[in-house]
């Protein structure tokens, strides 16, 4: 009964207005009140401020400044093996695995459409049919900048307007095509591992989605699909990003979906649903290397995994695995 009520609220509540209100409040300078809110947030979600370049919460003028806080360089060492792709975000893996023709796993027993995720772009979808996907959820406690899994040349970006459903266990199980319905920014790259899509998905109270090459993509929310393209290679106007480099960010966060072409990468064996991710740790390895790299994410302290799972609404998935 309670879950039915919560699900009904997802359809009834004015999610756009709640999101605008959250974005407005998070951008305001409120002095001691801003610090109080940040301190309460840090305590409730067990945010590790020792990792931040500015660990003192008084140094943030707005909640948004705190939310997109940069980390100290040394806390996320990058795996430098050229055959290894790295994790794009701190968070928890929601689902991962093979794309079955047009089907991507959303939750246990529930799929959604690859082509719908890509805004009906069947040519782009053809690049990834029977490929590999990884869906990473960023909880409120996480670092909310998104990084490149490998070197890439930006070729296309599509802004897709949509709903702003919350992303959690309940909605994943009950909202059909959740990620193909929510607002999102699709970024397509040429890489040495074939085409790669990195998709930043919005949700309720995600105030904005930004990229390093174009700034704020949303808001404004104009209700129309927008598309940009860039030249290949070293042509004038091309955008090249390096492995581990920041490519975007959420102001209040949500989900990152990565799509890889078929036969190009193998996901690291240790990864599974609910694995905790840290940027620049191994995510996948090339299928074209003669010697498979010894790629394995560094072990995390038990208290870090527990804190991440406590902050993630995806942990209810454990009930399905008993």
From Swiss-Prot:
GO terms for cellular component: plasma membrane. Is synthesized initially as an inactive proenzyme. Formation of the active enzyme involves a self-maturation process in which the active site pyruvoyl group is generated from an internal serine residue via an autocatalytic post-translational modification. Two non-identical subunits are generated from the proenzyme in this reaction, and the pyruvate is formed at the N-terminus of the alpha chain, which is derived from the carboxyl end of the proenzyme. Its main location: membrane. It is a peripheral membrane protein. Its EC number is 4.1.1.65. Residues 294-322 are annotated as: Disordered. It is found in: Cell membrane. GO terms for molecular function: phosphatidylserine decarboxylase activity. The record marks 253-254 as: Cleavage (non-hydrolytic). InterPro entries: PS_Dcarbxylase (IPR003817), PSD-B (IPR033177), PSD_type1_pro (IPR033178). It comes from the Bacteria. Its cofactor is pyruvate. The modification Pyruvic acid (Ser) is found at residue 254. Residues 308-322 have a biased composition (Basic and acidic residues). Pathway: Phospholipid metabolism; phosphatidylethanolamine biosynthesis; phosphatidylethanolamine from CDP-diacylglycerol: step 2/2. Heterodimer of a large membrane-associated beta subunit and a small pyruvoyl-containing alpha subunit. Belongs to the phosphatidylserine decarboxylase family. PSD-B subfamily. Prokaryotic type I sub-subfamily. This is Phosphatidylserine decarboxylase proenzyme.
């Amino acid at each position: 009964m309670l879950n039915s009520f919560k699900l009904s609220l997802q359809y009834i509540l004015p999610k756009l207005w709640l999101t605008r209100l959250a974005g407005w409040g998070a951008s305001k300078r409120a002095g001691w009140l801003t610090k109080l809110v940040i301190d309460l947030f840090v305590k409730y979600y067990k945010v590790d401020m020792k990792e931040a370049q500015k660990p003192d919460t008084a140094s943030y003028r707005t909640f948004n400044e705190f939310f997109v806080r940069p980390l100290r360089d040394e806390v996320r060492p990058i795996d430098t093996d050229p055959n290894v792709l790295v994790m794009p975000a701190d968070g928890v893996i929601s689902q991962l695995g093979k794309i079955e023709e047009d089907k991507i796993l959303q939750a246990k027993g529930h799929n959604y459409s690859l082509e719908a995720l890509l805004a009906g772009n069947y040519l782009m979808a053809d690049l990834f049919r029977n490929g590999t996907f990884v869906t990473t959820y960023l909880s409120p406690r996480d670092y909310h900048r998104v990084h490149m899994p490998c070197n890439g040349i930006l070729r296309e970006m599509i802004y897709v307007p949509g709903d702003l459903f919350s992303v959690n266990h309940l909605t994943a199980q009950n909202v059909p095509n959740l990620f193909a319905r929510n607002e999102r920014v699709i970024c397509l790259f040429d890489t040495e591992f074939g085409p790669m899509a990195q998709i930043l998905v919005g949700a309720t109270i995600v105030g904005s989605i930004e990229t390093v090459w174009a700034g704020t993509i949303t808001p404004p929310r104009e209700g129309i699909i927008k598309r940009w393209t860039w030249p290949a290679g070293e042509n004038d106007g091309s955008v090249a990003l390096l492995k581990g480099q920041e490519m975007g960010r959420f102001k209040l966060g949500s989900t990152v979906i990565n799509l890889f072409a078929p036969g190009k990468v193998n996901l690291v064996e240790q990864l599974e649903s609910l694995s905790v991710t840290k940027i620049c740790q191994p995510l996948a390895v090339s299928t074209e290397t003669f010697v498979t790299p010894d790629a394995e994410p560094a072990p995390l302290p038990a208290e870090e995994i527990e804190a991440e799972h406590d902050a993630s609404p995806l942990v209810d998935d454990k009930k399905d695995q008993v």
